[in-house]
Amino acid sequence: MTTTPPDRKDVHVAVLMGGWSAEREVSLSSGKECAAALEAEGFRVTRVDVDPNLAATLTALKPRVCFNALHGRWGEDGCVQGLLEILAIPYTHSGVLASSLAMHKEQTKRIVAKYGVPVAEALLVTPAQALADHVMSPPYVAKPIAEGSSVGVVIVKEGANRPPEAIGRIPVTRDNEIMVEPFIPGRELTCGVIGDKVTAIIDIVAAGHLEFYDYEAKYAPGGSKHILPAAIPGHVAERVQRHTLAAHKALGCRGVSRCDFRWDEAKDQLVFLEINTQPGMTPTSLIPELGAHAGMSFGQLVAWLVADASLNR
């Protein structure tokens, strides 16, 4: 016996956005785009700017599905996922465990490396240690362990006499730690997973005045150029796609995810940078672009995510 899917107008979707992380504005942009697209697809949508009263808000709203358009702390690290499990409201994207693991960059490296994904050496140090002297030979990158959108990333250039003071402003973990890893030169490549299918690859070229694919490059109009499909050798594309799918599965991700890599063309060296379980859904974001390249419109993508929503993720 087959069951008829409900009319979309009867499916009440609460789009969670905003919150109070460092990525609030990006989340608001993602959430607004997703909400508008879901309405155009025929769903009944409520926009929820997340605050500490979220449990009470959702209990009153009684949505059938929560579309998670949050980014950063609390929305991307397993916290809101755990709340939705407690409230028994199906939700999109990855679950509690995958979200919490993927948000911790160093733990992510440890896990995916066991599945053959190439990673760079990483050190966990306190800001005081990182400021006292170079903890590794420049060039290197100092970054938060649990932030996205390149928030707080500091590049220490080759020949730097001492660590820059900006390291002292990097957001720290509860253990007062940041992550330091070698600067990997080369091209920035990104690849996604939608469902269980790996996408094409984008070669990201940051605008000339930017050092790397930072917050401005990601979200400002003209901040970067996306070359899709990436003009790279077939053997490199195969490795990127294989490692992207391996990382997605190793962490137990669901829905969509996106992996970022650096490829040093001169050495033919590919290095995994990070995985994103809540990829941006703004007009300049990568997953919508990769979906469109595969023949999936933005409306179809968000509607598929709602259909894919579940508990026990």
PLM regions and their residue ranges:
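Short beta-strand-to-turn element immediately C-terminal to the catalytic PLP-Schiff-base lysine
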Residues: 125, 153-159, 193-195, 273, ...
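Active-site nucleotide/adenylate-binding loops and adjacent lid/helix of ATP-dependent enzymes
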Residues: 2-17, 45, 58-60, 101-187
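Short, flexible, mixed-charge acidic loops at enzyme active sites
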Residues: 80-85, 212-220, 277
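C-terminal active-site "lid" helix and adjoining low-complexity regulatory extension at the edge
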Residues: 3, 269-313
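ATP-binding N-terminal substructure of ATP-dependent carboxylate-amine bond-forming enzymes
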Residues: 1-97, 101-103, 107, 114, ...
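Conserved metal-phosphate-binding beta-hairpin within the catalytic cores
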Residues: 182, 248-283, 291
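Phosphate-binding site of ATP-dependent enzymes
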Residues: 162-242, 269-271
